[in-house]
Structures are given as structure tokens and as C-alpha cells.
Amino acid sequence: MMRQSVQTVLPESTGNNTLSLRDSVCRDLFQLFSSPHSPLPILLVSGMPEWQGHNQSDKLLQSWYCRQLRSALLFHEPRIAALQVNLKEAYCHELAISLEMMLYHDDEPLTFDLVWQKGNWHRTMPQ
């Protein structure tokens, strides 16, 4: 009986792989926020309009939103090792958030900024 062996070469972790990982995570996060069938809780993906009856400057409400969003994103995106959610602006019909994260197999932090305006999420470039 003859044995056959197959050699498998694992891809090296290069800058391009890291870049494509980062792009992939950002693309998937934006899709998670933008999809009408998103598994995220409706309040987390539909922005501030749900808060019209509340005080948008309420720090407890903002903190609750950030904790809920962080928990949901960590559950749905397993490539994120660490995540911090920050509210940059919170108005009645506009919400700006910043996601600062560390990905597994990536040594550099990644910032992903989103703005809820006119009923949709828009990606913004970090400043």
C-alpha cells in the first residue's frame, strides 16, 4: 500500500492580508448596520429617531446605548478582540458613533466611524 502525502502551505501574514482583514471587517460591519434584515436590535441600527421621547443628552442613556451596541457587535463579529463604542454626536435625528477596535491577528487599532442621517447609516473617515 502506497501512502500519498499532500503538503499544505499556510499563507503568511503579510501587510496585504492584514489590510484585507481590516477592509473585510469594515465592510461587514457597515453591512450589518445597513441591512434591513440586520440581526442587531432595531434600536441599535435605526439611530436616534427612536430616542425622540427621551433626552438625547442623558449620559445614562448614551452609556446604555454604547454598552448594548458593543455587546451586540462583539457577538456578531468574532474577528474583533477588543471594542470601544463612543458617541461623538447625539441629536434627535442624527447620531455619530466611533468604533475603536483591535482585531485578532492585527497589531494596529482600527477606527470605524458611522453617522445616522436621514434614515440611513453613512460611513465617515476618522479624523
UniProtKB/Swiss-Prot annotation:
Inhibits RpoS proteolysis by regulating RssB activity, thereby increasing the stability of the sigma stress factor RpoS during oxidative stress. Its effect on RpoS stability is due to its interaction with RssB, which probably blocks the interaction of RssB with RpoS, and the consequent delivery of the RssB-RpoS complex to the ClpXP protein degradation pathway. GO terms for molecular function: anti-sigma factor antagonist activity. Belongs to the GpW/Gp25 family. IraD subfamily. InterPro entries: Anti-adapt_IraD (IPR023776), IraD/Gp25-like (IPR007048). It comes from the Bacteria. This is Anti-adapter protein IraD. It is found in: Cytoplasm. Coiled coil: none annotated. The keyword Cytoplasm applies. GO terms for cellular component: cytoplasm. One of its GO terms (biological process) is DNA damage response. Interacts with RssB. Keywords: Cytoplasm, Stress response. It comes from Escherichia coli O1:K1 / APEC.
